[in-house]
Amino acid sequence: MVLPNFKENLEKYAQLLVANGINVQPGHTLALSIDVEQRELAHLIVKEAYALGAHEVIVQWTDDVINREKFLHAPMERLDNVPEYKIAEMNYLLENKASRLGVRSSDPGALNGVDADKLSASAKAMGLAMKPMRIATQSNKVSWTVAAAAGLEWAKKVFPNAASDEEAVDLLWDQIFKTCRVYEEDPVKAWEDHAAILKSKADMLNKEQFSALHYTAPGTDLTLGLPKNHVWESAGAINAQGEGFLPNMPTEEVFTAPDFRRADGYVTSTKPLSYNGNIIEGIKVTFKDGQIVDITAEKGDQVMKDLVFENAGARALGECALVPDPSPISQSGITFFNTLFDENASNHLAIGAAYATSVVGGAEMSEEELEAAGLNRSDVHVDFMIGSNQMDIDGIREDGTRVPLFRNGDWAN
């Protein structure tokens, strides 16, 4: 298989990411995080950003092989300390209100077999050191977009029966272009129409201001409280400078934060999770009074336990997102082993930090005020997928009346 018009579509994709995703404006600083394998796309993104008037584009290259070797051989005292130059770079980006574009293409199992203690220690250290950047991002002080590119090892996992490595990569690029509407005659208009549909769902939920959500499905019976004055968000967001951007490309979700003090019941994952270079399957979580009291996984059990019990704030939830099972990504029938795609095929929850914008006025609140409002504070934010065509969700009003939101995995109305 040779993907027709690949270079033309890759150029359209780069333009879409820069102009519509991150929405580069004259004078902007852009930080681009991208794998060395994606050099061609990186060059197109950099050219497009400067063409739109960016003053500086900083490329932060990543490499799965180098990263794995570091975890295999570096001593623990190096892994649980973040070098000063990384903190200095973060501060420079914050001072310049740099937009952040992350293009993900890593092998989902790049760190399989690496000592879980090393992974946990490094993730914890990075979470603490990068806290100012996380806060700026999660409160939309700066624009940020997460997108994807077809990495070889990732493509081989998604399409193991492809006739060749090249075909696997082409098949994955084809899915990325489809779900990001690159093939549409007018991709920008297609995104505007899609965003309007998602916004209508968010508007309905914001008007209702449900007190809680009740999820039921095989292996799931969970009630999540919602904070007062919570805000459901959808495709588009606005940064502190009043500029629009798209946090995720693709996206099919509407989302808010649950009240981290009010979660009771149990939930079972329905798709694999790729986290910290490991593929985790069969996650089961039990909640009582907002806290995770038990978590197990059929594969990657220790990685999940370390995530929840070794990181501050990771025993509670920071996000609940609604995605209908008939979404295009779900209907493709493909498991992508990549949260950006798999979360947009399924209802999902996030362990850890809530986005500040999930309550009215949250972007201007202190960490203490956000916590008092019911928004979980943590150094981690990890989505896991729980939806299926067997899931029902009810919205529960203050007076206890129930409104069907989802039936058999799709919007009830």
Regions found by a protein language model. Give the residues of each.
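Short solvent-exposed loop/turn micro-motifs enriched in small/polar/acidic residues
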Residues: 15, 206-208, 276-279, 313, ...
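A short secondary-structure junction signal
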Residues: 112-115, 155-160, 236-237, 278-281, ...
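Extended hydrophobic packing segments that form well-structured cores
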Residues: 368-413
